Amino acid sequence: MRWRWRHGAERYEDARVTSNPPLGTRTLGRAGLRVATLGLGCMGMSQGYGAADRDESIATVHRALDLGVTFLDTSDVYGDGHNEELVGEAIAGRRGEVQLATKFSLSRGDAGMVLDGRPENVRACAEASLRRLRVDVIDLYYQHRVDPRVPIEDTVGAMAELVQQGKVRFLGLSEASAASIRRAVAVHPIAALQSEWSLWTRDLEMAGGGAAGEDTVLGVAREHGIGIVPFSPLGRGFLTGAITTPDDFAADDFRRGHPRFTGDAFAANLRLVDAVRGMAEEKGCTPGQLALAWVLAQGDDVVPIPGTKRRAYLEENVGAAALELSAEDLARLAAIAPPGAAEGGRYADAAYAYGDSPERGAR
């Protein structure tokens, strides 16, 4: 089978799974948050991946709801609030169809990103998000990153008060360590853990997210009945096979400075994608669909949230739900992309992956 590129060399056009059967739902957490099997990450509609067309972004959200992709993910830091406003506008009149997730604790300061998990900030951020989203309740409220200065018990305690007040339905953590998860669930049930997980980022499966002598973050989350919400399940677009050179990125695309998209790491990671591409051709799907199907196959407690700001890419992603991977397929993919296979760090040093907080009373 021959592959043909769309204009702009962005996605494969042939051999794409295009049937879109009903997505169904999955459950996050023991408390029973039912969400669509596949979510939509909305960040790129406001930042990170070059310019976005507002009308196309809103149309993408509407198309997502039409296709049953009703689990929408945003954050107060995306576009400094713009993303929440955009999502709020897009879901106006369709709120009943949506499972809405947003996050707090990250903001931009003069010297870079600022973390704030203080209880008073939890409350202030929630009120601001409710206003921007134009809703009365947030279905899933995450701490975006663990604040290393504030005991997580204090942060989650303030989040739990929002549940008691009816402003939030379920609580989540993002990029938290195994130890932080254990401390958080002692305060209030956690429905979901959001973390990067894909064929080229399998740190979640590694001890301590990569540190020796610790439990896996994935194992601890599952021990406590916490659902997994993988972000960047397509490797920030790399696993679609569309990116062949750093010049494919717009000038304001953050991937230009990402460790895995620069220098020797870029060339090494292209070889991984080439192997995925070859298998996808055999399966009659795109590389991105195969990569996304692998994430979906990791368990019924897994709900990936691939991001896009275009309807065409959304529809391609939804097609991944129609793919069935055999045990042999999964074994082949595991051999192609074992944990640690990708070259380069997944974050810059200041990104607070798998964060910890101080013990209460510590100085």
What does each model-identified segment do?
Residues 40-42, 74, 140-143, 173, ...:
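Conserved beta-strand positions
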Residues 52-64, 117-133, 177-182:
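Short, acidic/polar
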Residues 2-99, 360-363:
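N-terminal binding-site loop/beta-alpha segment at the start of enzyme catalytic domains
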Residues 52-56, 82, 86, 113-124, ...:
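Alpha-helix N-cap and loop-to-helix initiation/capping positions
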Residues 44-49, 107-113, 203-204, 313-316:
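A short acidic, helix-capping loop that chelates divalent metal ions and anchors anionic groups
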Residues 63, 67, 132-133, 166, ...:
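Structural motif
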Residues 130-148:
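Active-site groove signature of glycoside hydrolases
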Residues 8, 22, 146, 150-336, ...:
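Beta/alpha (TIM)-barrel catalytic core signal, keyed to glycine-rich beta->alpha loops juxtaposed to Asp/Glu
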